[in-house]
Amino acid sequence: MNTKQSRIRRARKTRAKIAAVKAIRLAIHRTNSHIYAQIISADGGTVMASASSNDKDLRGQLANGGTTAAAAAVGKRLAEKAKGLGIEKVAFDRAGFKFHGRVKALAEAAREGGLAF
């Protein structure tokens, strides 16, 4: 089993637990160049809010989209959008990535912005 398959296996287990609780989830995806985050409805069918380091407004502010500073900016932006929609509690879906570095920076910024998980 290679690294990607292991990550996908971990993600599948996490998503199954979140689906069983029927919680709104904050899903992330990390690449070398950018980080993406979405708030997905409890049924898993609708993206309610999204933010990424590749968005036009953030791209101008960031020198590089693959840094912890970029991840923190994405987390803060997503928390603002969620507050606008009245979402305060979510389940954090780290998509099998380690809770370290950019993933942790995004999560902490989202918490500071008012999201609870």
UniProtKB/Swiss-Prot annotation:
Transmembrane segments: none annotated. It comes from the Bacteria. GO terms for biological process: translation. GO terms for cellular component: cytosolic large ribosomal subunit. Disulfide bonds: none annotated. Keywords: Ribonucleoprotein, Ribosomal protein, RNA-binding, rRNA-binding. SUPFAM superfamilies: Translational machinery components. HAMAP family: Ribosomal_uL18_B. Belongs to the universal ribosomal protein uL18 family. Part of the 50S ribosomal subunit; part of the 5S rRNA/L5/L18/L25 subcomplex. Contacts the 5S and 23S rRNAs. This is one of the proteins that bind and probably mediate the attachment of the 5S RNA into the large ribosomal subunit, where it forms part of the central protuberance. This is Large ribosomal subunit protein uL18.
